[in-house]
A protein has these predicted regions:
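C-terminal active-site "lid" helix and adjoining low-complexity regulatory extension at the edge
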Residues: 281, 295-299, 308-358
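Rossmann-like NAD(P)H-binding beta-loop-alpha module
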Residues: 164-187
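ATP-grasp fold ATP-binding core
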Residues: 155-157, 181-199, 221-236
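A short beta-strand motif that forms the metal-chelation/ATP-contact edge
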Residues: 15-22, 107-112, 238-241, 306, ...
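Conserved hydrophobic helix-helix packing surfaces used for dimerization/oligomerization
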Residues: 61-63, 188, 201
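A short glycine-rich, hydrophobically flanked beta-strand micro-motif that places a catalytic Asp/Glu
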Residues: 2-8, 95-98, 227, 299-310
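Conserved N-proximal alpha/beta basic substrate-recognition cap immediately N-terminal to
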Residues: 1, 11-165
Length: 358
C-alpha cells in the first residue's frame, strides 16, 4: 500500500506528468497533512461494495426440476407453491437443473421433482446429496427400490403384502412364456422393470399378442414382469410422508382405456379424472396397506398405487417421487400440502444442524 504519492508535472506547451514517486507523511506541510487526514477519513468511511443483505432464510433447499419434461411429477404452479411454503418456514427453495450438479453441496437439502431413474442424473444427484450429508428426498435407496418393478415386487412378496399374481419372464427362457396363460389367464399385463406413468406396460388378450408383445419388450430388457389383469374403474393413490398418510386420491382410468394414462390419445382423453379426499374418508384398509407397503421402502415421500376389487385389495406399486400437481393432489389440503412437505425438510435439516440422528 502506498497512501501518499507525489506527482510532478512539466509543461512543454501542455502540462504532462513527469514523475510519480511514493513519499512519506513527514514530507507534508501542515496544510497538506490536514488535507491528507480529511481524505483518509473520507476513504475509510466509503463502502466499496454493497453490504450483504441480512439473511432471511435459515436453510437453503435445492429443488431439482426439468422445465422440458412432458410429464413432470409437479406442474409449474405446484413448484411455485413449494417455493412459497418454504419461504414461510425460513427455507429458501432454489429450482435447479441437471446442469447444477457442481453447486449441489452449497445447499442444506435436495428435493427431487423430476422423474427419477437409475440411469440418469436424478440418481447421481441423490447419491451426491447423501454423501454430502444433505437432507434428500428422494433418497438413493428409495429410488433404487421403487424404480425397478421386479425388485419392488420381490420386496412386497417378502413382506407378504397382497399384490396381483405375478411371474417373472426371462428373455432366454421361452418355455416360461408358454406357461403364462395357464398361470395367469387372459387378459394379462406385461411390464418393463423401469416403466413410469403407464409407459412400458402392455395388456395382451391372447397367445399371439402375448408372444408379439414379449418379443418387442425383450428388445429393450432381459426381464419382463407379467401380472394378472385386475380391472377397476380407478386406482387408489395414497401419498405417504415419513410413514404418515398425507393425501388420498382416486385416479380414474382414461376414457375408453384400461390405464390412467393413454399415451396414444390426444387432449383431455390422455388421462382420466381424479377425486381427492381427506385421508380419514378413504377406506381404512387402503390406508393401512399403503403404510405397510412404504414401511418396506423407507421414511421419504411416496405414492402408493392400489387396486380394490370387491373384497380384494392389492398393492400395484410404490412410487418414489410421486405426482404432486396443483389442482389435483392438493385439491383437499391446498397450501397445507406444500407446507407439510417443507416442514418435514425443516425438521430434518434442523436435526442435521444439531448433529442429531434421524
Amino acid at each position: 500500500p502506498c497512501p501518499i504519492l507525489r506527482i510532478e508535472f512539466e509543461r512543454e506547451r501542455v502540462w504532462q506528468i513527469s514523475a510519480i514517486k511514493p513519499t512519506g507523511l513527514h514530507t507534508l506541510s501542515d496544510p497538506q497533512e490536514d488535507a491528507f487526514a480529511q481524505a483518509l477519513d473520507k476513504f475509510s468511511k466509503k463502502l466499496w461494495r454493497k453490504p450483504r443483505q441480512r439473511r432471511k432464510f435459515r436453510f437453503d433447499l435445492a429443488m431439482l426440476a426439468d422445465a422440458n419434461d412432458p410429464m413432470p411429477p409437479s406442474n409449474k404452479r405446484a413448484l411455485k407453491r413449494f417455493v412459497d411454503a418454504g419461504a414461510e418456514l425460513g427455507i429458501e427453495v432454489d429450482t435447479i437443473s441437471k446442469n447444477d450438479y457442481t453447486k449441489l453441496a452449497e445447499y442444506d437439502g435436495l428435493f427431487i421433482r423430476e422423474t427419477t431413474a437409475l440411469d440418469n442424473h436424478t440418481y447421481r444427484f441423490a447419491n451426491k446429496a447423501e454423501k454430502e450429508d444433505m437432507v434428500v428426498i428422494d433418497d438413493p435407496s428409495s429410488i433404487l427400490k421403487c424404480t425397478n418393478k421386479i425388485y419392488l415386487h420381490d420386496l412386497m412378496k417378502a413382506r407378504k403384502l397382497p399384490t396381483p399374481k405375478t411371474e417373472i419372464l426371462y428373455r432366454d427362457e421361452p418355455k416360461r412364456l408358454a406357461e403364462l396363460p395357464d398361470l395367469l389367464g387372459f387378459p394379462l399385463v406385461l411390464k418393463i422393470p423401469d416403466g413410469s406413468f403407464s409407459r412400458g406396460i402392455v395388456k395382451v388378450e391372447n397367445v399371439e399378442r402375448l408372444k408379439a408383445a414379449a418379443d418387442d419388450l425383450f428388445q429393450h430388457t432381459a426381464l419382463v414382469l407379467a401380472q394378472e389383469f385386475m380391472f377397476t374403474e380407478f386406482d387408489w393413490r395414497v401419498g405417504v410422508l415419513n410413514r404418515e398418510p398425507l393425501y388420498a386420491c382416486k385416479y380414474y382410468m382414461s376414457r375408453g382405456h384400461w390405464q390412467i394414462y393413454n399415451h396414444n390419445a390426444k387432449g383431455a382423453a390422455k388421462s382420466g379424472g381424479f377425486e381427492t379426499m381427506p385421508v380419514r374418508e378413504a377406506p381404512s384398509d387402503v390406508i393401512k396397506l399403503a403404510l405397510r407397503a412404504t414401511a418396506a421402502i423407507g421414511d421419504g415421500l411416496y405414492g402408493v398405487d392400489l387396486k380394490q376389487s370387491s373384497d380384494r385389495l392389492a398393492v400395484i406399486e410404490v412410487n418414489d417421487n410421486p405426482s404432486i400437481d396443483a389442482g389435483i393432489e392438493d385439491a383437499y389440503l391446498g397450501e397445507d400440502l406444500y407446507r407439510r412437505i417443507m416442514d418435514e425438510f425443516l425438521k430434518r435439516m434442523e436435526r442435521k444442524r444439531l448433529g442429531l440422528r434421524s
